């Protein structure tokens, strides 16, 4: 019998802040399970979830507007601690009898709050002291409205010159509000405040750890599928790889992985996937060489979105054909992770701002009545990686840079041809190898090479040549929503360029992309 790792749980109500998923990740980092729900949940849903505590997130709306979101009244009647962050504090104050006003002055960026009153939330937590010995906290503010009167049964815990109620508390009811964002690293003691709330005030045990998550997932897979057979599309990416390892641990040879080699992978990637999962870990893998099929389907197509659709469609066709060859498979496994679940829920309700449509393996043949197994669907990406390490997958594989689902299909601009893919693979491998050698790979968030379908004149020896151009791209980002181009050293870029032009016959020029996001996207297509 595995331990119930969901026993203590925090409910986070999302009012639309860009940082809300970060709040959830911070709570998970503290070893406590949490879920992220839209703000307008019902009393019955909250009762059913039975949280140990509730966090009200920040959000872009103004509580002074008539139809702005409000926390369900039951939040304040459930008898559990409540922590309001930024907008969450404002709606708490307003709903419990305080007052909020719009302000002409937005407070955005660093601020120092002075702790005036002892509180369980910040006791013993400080960044520095005032001349008369009062604790000061360095925090990150991002708000326009502010609380101008707190509810009568609350006390002011901390303030700044422009924000008289930076922290408010009702210690008896264990209700706390902060006008800043404790979840961002700029609030230096933010993690300690969250820990104080989650672990001490809500009294949650740290049961959410990689080893226990694995035990729980294995037990749940066995309970769900029993002795049935399961099929998984293994791409070699982080999510499908960790899914494969979890399923293999749970059901062994009853798992069949289908690895579709579409000819759009990185250099030697197909061989590496087969060696690692087949030979080293002993998984049951069907290797489907399908390069010709993908490239002929892509022939003549220049439009990026059309290329994505073609690659997706052909993948599903190939996967379906392989699935039909297997006898008695009852379950399809997918590497869906928690942000995918949040995005789909948001697109279904229209509440959050969906950035992209997410595609996992879809469109199985109608004659295949299969159940769905999604062992990662409660996990954030950083948690998936930690679990992968615990399961024995190599660090370099788990922490390598993102690679798009359509692969080189969207890194070869315009029409995709085998010749272009082969040149790009070799150029990209040199760039990545040099980044690793220079200890720069982990210092950038993503780096790759793009094939440009234009020829340029070059000189090699005594002769002229007329060959292709590639662009190097490297960015630094925290969340991939915005990004800066990476300021790689000139001598490093020169070395990479020299190697590519000398070692990859067919490329005569290398350029470096210095566009930020926005206005450019990270990928070119």
UniProtKB/Swiss-Prot annotation:
InterPro entries: Class_I_gatase-like (IPR029062), GATASE (IPR017926), GMP_synth_C (IPR001674), GMP_synth_GATase (IPR004739), GMP_synthase (IPR022955), GMPS_ATP_PPase_dom (IPR025777), NAD/GMP_synthase (IPR022310), Rossmann-like_a/b/a_fold (IPR014729). This is GMP synthase [glutamine-hydrolyzing]. One of its GO terms (cellular component) is cytosol. Keywords: ATP-binding, Glutamine amidotransferase, GMP biosynthesis, Ligase, Nucleotide-binding, Purine biosynthesis. Pathway: Purine metabolism; GMP biosynthesis; GMP from XMP (L-Gln route): step 1/1. Its EC number is 6.3.5.2. PROSITE patterns: GATASE_TYPE_1, GMPS_ATP_PPASE. The keyword Transport does not apply. Catalyzes the synthesis of GMP from XMP. ATP binds at residues 235-241. It comes from Salmonella heidelberg (strain SL476). Homodimer. It catalyses: XMP + L-glutamine + ATP + H2O = GMP + L-glutamate + AMP + diphosphate + 2 H(+). Pfam families: GATase, GMP_synt_C, NAD_synthase. CDD domains: GATase1_GMP_Synthase (cd01742), GMP_synthase_C (cd01997). Gene3D superfamilies: 3.30.300.10, 3.40.50.880, HUPs. PANTHER family: GMP SYNTHASE [GLUTAMINE-HYDROLYZING], GMP SYNTHASE-RELATED. It comes from the Bacteria. Residues 9-207 form the Glutamine amidotransferase type-1 domain. GO terms for molecular function: ATP binding; GMP synthase activity. Residues 208-400 form the GMPS ATP-PPase domain. The active site is at residues 86, 181, 183. Coiled coil: none annotated. SUPFAM superfamilies: Adenine nucleotide alpha hydrolases-like, Class I glutamine amidotransferase-like, GMP synthetase C-terminal dimerisation domain.
